[in-house]
């Protein structure tokens, strides 16, 4: 593989012409964060910001106080998984990506236990979306559930909740 530094300027094309405009763009800024070990309790029917207290990585220092502020214009891909503990049967649960304090994209899952009992000790939902960001935009994750206060799983479990994003190279 060629180092990125060697992919700038003009390169010869097969036709004999020169290729120009080739850049070594990458997928940064990027981050991944998880909740603290004990997670957080989410109140019934209230939209609450998830507190992401542990950074797994943060390539450019753009994630702080549970908020991603890329400061680099472009398209970003966001991924979030929320693991709820003790969700009741037949419950609406939501994850929303907020952009600049307003809902940008929401996903919902409906918890149903085929045995007819409670929804079980663990339920999960995932959000995947691409968003355009200007230099001053910021992004956060909010959740809502309709069955009473529920616990968002933290980092004590290998399959817990997480929030991540990265810039799409060239976008």
What are these regions (language model features)?
Residues 5-8, 37, 137:
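Short intrinsically disordered, low-complexity segments
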Residues 21-91, 95, 99, 107-115, ...:
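Terminal (often C-terminal
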Residues 142-148:
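Short beta-strand-plus-loop segments that form exposed binding edges in beta-rich domains
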Residues 1-28:
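Fibrous stalk/shaft segments of extracellular and virion attachment machinery
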Residues 77, 138-140:
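Short, conserved beta-strand segments of beta-strand-rich sandwich/propeller modules, principally
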Residues 117-138:
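Short, surface-exposed tryptophan/glycine-enriched loops
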